[in-house]
């Protein structure tokens, strides 16, 4: 759970609730689901809150939530933006960090508290949504220190910066907290911040860089140049974000802009010129979620009028437009946590105040117990642990690259794991765009992230896999699967077969393994798993191409089959 340090006096000033004492503030924060964890030596509140409410990573975001909670603000608030005077020209960027966004901030009053809050928000976003800068990184610069080409435009941006890829040993700049000119490669080996984030650019032939007329001033995702350092004297800022996913960096940018808007700053658009399209950023577009009236009443257990729901939505910082069966609810751009209609209902419940809801027992009399399938799954997990495997639980969502490409597989192959995947609508991340069709790729990814640990590594998972199926009500067919890998110097088909045979003996089923071919396994070292005479999965030694793709340093053998075959 994220923890932030908040100055209570600054919180009072931003909310306008100057007369409230610390106890009253703590009570208001508790009403938002924000836990008070104590105070720092300087008297700041240490606050812990839900990991999904990234808009509350700063005092400005918490103040906004308190103002809505108190009824001071209502509905979706979209900041006004001025026409762009700056552009970012995107050319020859590294393929693994192709996206950029930004904003110009004018008229900001950065005293020491405001600057500390901005830096804390930047670093908290890096640690959470930015995945420690791997997915998204923020650079904040003093705009007065930037020099851009001035061109005669037709109402479009007139000053241009360049986001590009450069030679690691090419141009030099003076990084923050330094006084020496260094190349990007030097920064990664000679600067403390560079050493911290060097792994993000390991084995890269080109590094990301942002230039103005003077030269290199930003080396994302590592560090900014000292020339554009932001101080309490800065009144105009340039905010740039780079990353692996446009949606993610756009949402991070929106959170930064809303925080500065709360301090009275003016936001100005930036034109992002990709080779194939032009974007105007920041992106303050609202999203819309439809939620039925019945769902609201069922989940909250309260009967509402249409007018009451619209009022609750406005008090929650949303806007609800009635429809025939419910409401189209507009979501502000900083609310990255609202992904489902249930999230909207949760907001409505908080606006209503959960303390005013009357708990009641369900109108059923049942005696709980494990289902047959749950008992089987538990027994298989215990058996795998007894056979020396580490029991894992991975995400059911993945990407086509992980599920197919890195396993040398395509959806059209006639092989275990090959199937048309169920795709995710409006994916939160390009890392999670489909439901996995098999579990072995998930175990391969775990091996990839644990190459720094000693071998052998014997891993197993009992989980779910799925594929698209138009004949089902949901369009998805789901099944439970058992997968295991053995990573060690002497891993072989025979080792995997021995473990699988022991597992089948435990459940009193007959195992046969006729030879087969599979793109993910070595030819001649793979077999079909037949249990009680029925094909159920595949076993073998992973193909060297798969092993190299995942940077695993030892041979790997593994198997996967359908759990229900053990019934």
Swiss-Prot record:
GO cellular component, one term: phenylalanine-tRNA ligase complex
Subcellular location field: Cytoplasm
Cofactor: Mg(2+)
Recorded catalytic activity of this chain's protein: tRNA(Phe) + L-phenylalanine + ATP = L-phenylalanyl-tRNA(Phe) + AMP + diphosphate + H(+)
Gene field: pheT
Entry keyword Ligase: yes
Residues in B5 domain copies: 284-359
Major subcellular location class: cytoplasm
Name used for this protein in its record: Phenylalanine--tRNA ligase beta subunit
PANTHER family: PHENYLALANINE--TRNA LIGASE BETA SUBUNIT, PHENYLALANYL-TRNA SYNTHETASE BETA CHAIN AND LEUCINE-RICH REPEAT-CONTAINING PROTEIN 47
Similarity section: Belongs to the phenylalanyl-tRNA synthetase beta subunit family. Type 2 subfamily.
Organism taxonomic ancestry: Archaea, Methanobacteriati, Methanobacteriota, Stenosarchaea group, Halobacteria
EC number: 6.1.1.20
Keywords tagged on the record: Aminoacyl-tRNA synthetase, ATP-binding, Cytoplasm, Ligase, Magnesium, Metal-binding, Nucleotide-binding, Protein biosynthesis
GO molecular function: ATP binding; magnesium ion binding; phenylalanine-tRNA ligase activity; RNA binding
Keyword match Metal-binding: yes
Chain sites annotated for binding Mg(2+): 337, 343, 346-347
PROSITE patterns, per the entry: B5 (PS51483)
